[in-house]
Amino acid sequence: ANSFGHESYILQAAAEFPNVQFCHATGYQAAGSGLSNMHNYFTSIYESRYVSGVVAGMKLNEMIADGKITEDTAKVGYVGAYPYAEVISGFTSFFLGVRSQCPSATMEVKYTNSWASFDLEKECAESLIADKCVLISQHADTTGAPTACEAAGVPCVGYNISMIPTAPNTALTSASINWEPYYESATKSVIDGTAID
């Protein structure tokens, strides 16, 4: 399963089907579940978040150099899904990347309390733009925030997929995850009859 919100269901299935291996992305309950067929996995997304923050910081510097904003108004907005460790570590990495390029930058975070709500993500982005954020990033799963950014002409950094089709004039980059190495490793372990790491 590839979403945080699926973990309780995967735990139930793992208990019901002990001869099947279950792997759940982004969760945290496998180790304490007592189920030998339940596994959690994640990637080093903080690295991609940091690099996308560097890109955002470079864009802020460009906007400062062009006179569109000042160092004092280099404010970034971040649309987060939930105030969970995964989201907080993600926006922290992103902001460290931003500040590596634009030390005067500040950041405001708003949460949707949903992993995927186009309307809430769009509303959060619009609210951040109204709060004078000049660049928006996200840890949420729809194109809501980039849609708001494109309409307002505000640069944005996406998540999971390229947002260029949604925001062709404002999307800078997206932090994305390559799950393939884990899937290959877990599948090979099942085929070989070895433990899944």
PLM feature spans:
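A residue-level marker of the well-folded mature domains of exported/periplasmic proteins
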Residues: A1-D197
